[in-house]
């Protein structure tokens, strides 16, 4: 499987501030690559460099196996993209907007606009003014515009940002269809980890401009650990009892009386009995598994995600 995007020590500085710091990413052909990070982690800056919108301070970019800086014009003809919120003429229809874009980029195929509108599910909205579109419809129209020239690579910057649950589900279905049915390689940035979790083949996690990890998602799922979660009236007492009676040391203490126990998974009944007999109220017991979001928070050292 060939490599579609490869960066080597890609760095972008603004004054003394490193927005992207020696970034090395590898995106394989046909994959959906999830580029994950908190807001301000360097995701959009990276995408702008990949699209030639800003120049890196140092480092190399190869796309389709070619040096991006030496073959920028030819490479960009093979890429579709959405960076941040796509802009359109609000007083024109979807078809009229796409017609303008088609003329600008030299697309003359007669049915190109009809085809991309059907791909994104807007074929029945051709007469409605874009100003009356929902945010989800505008995002899909943005993808339609990005598909006009039949790209091999699609780069999407936070395409689910601001969408309601239905819009997110529709966007996820569309992205999956483009990758798996039309063999388009997709590079998608996001901080909405639960959406990426259901979509991607590979994950790259960026924090403060640095790539912390790049891993196939299947491997990441195997790494995520199961645990017993207790919600208790007295965490401190419960921890002492677990250590003394069961020699349990692989656990985490969370807010709201939550303790996650990563060992002794088959002994929840005995643990429950231990707590109750020692005057601890057991409010909840569940068997759960770390999500990608849990792993992400641990990897970046805690804190909020957004």
Swiss-Prot record:
InterPro entries: AAA+_ATPase, ABC_transporter-like_ATP-bd, ABC_transporter-like_CS, P-loop_NTPase. ATP binds at residues 37-44. GO terms for molecular function: ATP binding; ATP hydrolysis activity. The keyword Calcium does not apply. It comes from the Bacteria. Residues 5-233 form the ABC transporter domain. Keywords: Antibiotic resistance, ATP-binding, Nucleotide-binding, Transport. SMART domains: AAA. The keyword DNA repair does not apply. GO terms for biological process: response to antibiotic. Part of the binding-protein-dependent transport system for bacitracin that confer resistance to this antibiotic. Probably responsible for energy coupling to the transport system. Belongs to the ABC transporter superfamily. This is Bacitracin transport ATP-binding protein BcrA.
């Amino acid at each position: 499987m060939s490599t579609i995007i490869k960066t080597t020590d890609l760095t972008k500085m603004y004054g003394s501030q490193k927005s992207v710091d020696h970034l090395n990413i590898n995106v394989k052909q046909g994959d959906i690559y999830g580029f994950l990070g908190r807001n301000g982690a360097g995701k959009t800056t990276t995408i702008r460099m990949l699209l030639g919108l800003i120049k890196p301070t140092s480092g190399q970019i190869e796309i389709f196996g070619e040096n991006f800086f030496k073959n920028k014009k030819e490479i960009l003809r093979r890429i579709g993209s959405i960076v941040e919120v796509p802009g359109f003429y609000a007083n024109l229809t979807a078809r009229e907007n796409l017609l303008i874009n088609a003329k600008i980029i030299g697309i003359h195929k007669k049915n190109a606009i009809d085809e991309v509108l059907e791909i994104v599910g807007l074929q029945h909205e051709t007469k409605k003014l874009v100003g009356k579109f929902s945010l989800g419809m505008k995002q899909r129209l943005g993808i339609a515009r990005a598909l006009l020239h039949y790209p091999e690579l699609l780069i999407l910057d936070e395409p689910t940002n601001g969408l309601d649950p239905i819009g997110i589900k529709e966007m996820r279905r569309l992205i999956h269809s483009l990758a798996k049915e039309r063999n388009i390689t997709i590079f998608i940035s996001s901080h909405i980890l639960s959406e990426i979790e259901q979509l991607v083949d590979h994950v790259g996690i960026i924090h403060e401009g640095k790539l912390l990890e790049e891993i196939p998602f299947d491997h990441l799922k195997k790494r995520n650990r199961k645990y017993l979660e207790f919600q208790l009236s007295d965490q401190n007492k419960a921890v002492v009892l677990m250590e003394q009676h069961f020699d349990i040391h692989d656990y985490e203490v969370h807010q709201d009386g939550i303790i996650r126990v990563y060992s002794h998974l088959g002994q929840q009944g005995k643990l429950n009995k231990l707590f109750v007999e020692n005057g601890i109220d057991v409010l909840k017991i569940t068997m759960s598994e770390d999500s990608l979001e849990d792993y992400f928070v641990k990897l970046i050292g805690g804190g909020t995600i957004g």
